[in-house]
């Protein structure tokens, strides 16, 4: 990934710009007329890595989400509450889908998978 580029003429920031005639990526100074060809066509890359536990922490009220299915066929190992919401997601480093449960006890919110 490239870092910020600066103009060789006036030391201001170079901004990505398309040369429409040649269909190439350039970096151009907005202060002077300096331009240079980009050595890489990637201007910005955003990689997002979240584990399922991070996703359920982001959704702190996941147990009260009315769109998620609920079951009374499981029992929480932490508080013995008999109701949980469940959803499927891919676990990090695993292929296929995994079934995740979140305890519906508002004082617990324990998460586990099967």
Swiss-Prot record:
Keywords annotated in UniProt: DNA-directed RNA polymerase, Metal-binding, Nucleus, Transcription, Zinc, Zinc-finger
Family matches, as Gene3D superfamilies: 2.20.25.10
SUPFAM superfamilies: Zinc beta-ribbon
GO MF term list: DNA-directed RNA polymerase activity; nucleic acid binding; zinc ion binding
Main localization (coarse): nucleus
Binding site for Zn(2+) 2: 76, 79, 103, 108
Protein's UniProt keywords contain Zinc-finger: yes
SMART domains: RPOL9 (SM00661), ZnF_C2C2 (SM00440)
Zn-finger region bounds: TFIIS-type: 72-113
Alphabetized InterPro entries for the sequence: DNA-dir_RNA_pol-M_15_CS (IPR019761), Rpa12/Rpb9/Rpc10/TFS (IPR012164), Zn_ribbon_RPB9 (IPR001529), Zn_ribbon_RPB9_C (IPR034012), Znf_TFIIS (IPR001222)
A cellular component annotation (GO) from this entry: RNA polymerase V complex
Subcellular location: Nucleus, Nucleolus
Biological processes per GO annotation: DNA-templated transcription; gene silencing by siRNA-directed DNA methylation
Pfam families: Zn_ribbon_RPB9, Zn_ribbon_TFIIS
Disruption phenotype: Shorter siliques and ovate leaves with shorter petioles, smaller trichomes, prominent leaf veins and changed cuticular wax coating. Loss of methylation at RdDM target sites. Partially redundant with NRPB9A with respect to Pol II. Nrpb9a and nrpb9b double mutants are embryo lethal.
Superkingdom field: Eukaryota
Binding residues annotated for Zn(2+) 1, in chain numbering: 7, 10, 29, 32
Self-association and partners: Component of the RNA polymerase II, IV and V complexes. Interacts with NRPD1.
Function: DNA-dependent RNA polymerase catalyzes the transcription of DNA into RNA using the four ribonucleoside triphosphates as substrates. Component of RNA polymerase II which synthesizes mRNA precursors and many functional non-coding RNAs. Pol II is the central component of the basal RNA polymerase II transcription machinery. It is composed of mobile elements that move relative to each other.
Recorded family membership: Belongs to the archaeal RpoM/eukaryotic RPA12/RPB9/RPC11 RNA polymerase family.
Miscellaneous field: The loss of silencing in nrpb9b mutants is due to a defect in Pol V function, but not at the level of transcription. Pol IV functions are not impaired in nrpb9b mutants and Pol II functions are partially complemented by NRPB9A.
Name by which UniProt lists this protein: DNA-directed RNA polymerases II, IV and V subunit 9B
Organism for this UniProt entry: Arabidopsis thaliana
